[in-house]
A protein has these predicted regions:
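A shared catalytic/ligand-binding motif for oxyanion handling
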Residues: 1-170
Length: 170
């Protein structure tokens, strides 16, 4: 799986398409795509890929650009998009998230791709973990969580110190 925060694809569609065409990734995850309904998937990927994306909801976020997540799968990979609309994630309107179940005849796992805008309060992250923990279908399953949490100073094992830091978003 290849992952990248793209900081906008709208002006890079041709170069991105060509770049993907010359690589051989089975799964591609992108955050901060900045895409909207005016950019079609075929501008970004050849027919070798199936694409799932969630563009930022500009009305809900009161933003005019930014955000957005996208997962692209080689066409021979079986997957199913999981609808999170009727879960606790629906209250986290600032976050862009996709959940996909990837499977073959004998194995499956879930991929969660997400983008969290900068300067979210601690309460937001608490709500995220509460929403994640409420998903019954992931119990006992293999999961991959990838994306941009916008926690630039966070490193593994320093969460208590990080949250106690006076510079942590309020």
């Amino acid at each position: 799986m290849y992952y990248q925060n793209t900081r906008g694809l709208n002006s890079k569609t041709v170069s991105f398409f060509n770049s993907v065409y010359t690589t051989n990734f089975d799964i591609i995850g992108l955050t901060e795509t900045w895409l909207n309904e005016n950019v079609s998937n075929c501008e970004l990927f050849s027919s070798d890929y199936n694409v799932v994306r969630k563009d930022r909801n500009f009305l809900a976020t009161d933003k005019s650009r930014g955000g957005g997540v996208l997962l692209a799968f080689k066409s021979d990979i079986a997957f199913e998009k999981i609808n999170l609309d009727n879960t606790l994630f629906s209250s986290l309107t600032q976050m862009d998230i996709i959940c996909v179940k990837v499977y073959n005849d004998s194995y499956f796992f879930y991929i969660f791709l997400l983008y969290v805008p900068p300067a979210q309060p601690v309460k937001f992250y608490q709500m995220f973990f509460e929403a994640f923990g409420s998903l019954d279908f992931i119990v006992g399953a293999d999961i991959v969580i990838v994306g941009d949490f916008n926690l630039p100073d966070f490193v593994q094992n320093n969460l208590p110190e990080y949250c106690d830091n006076p510079n942590f978003p309020p």
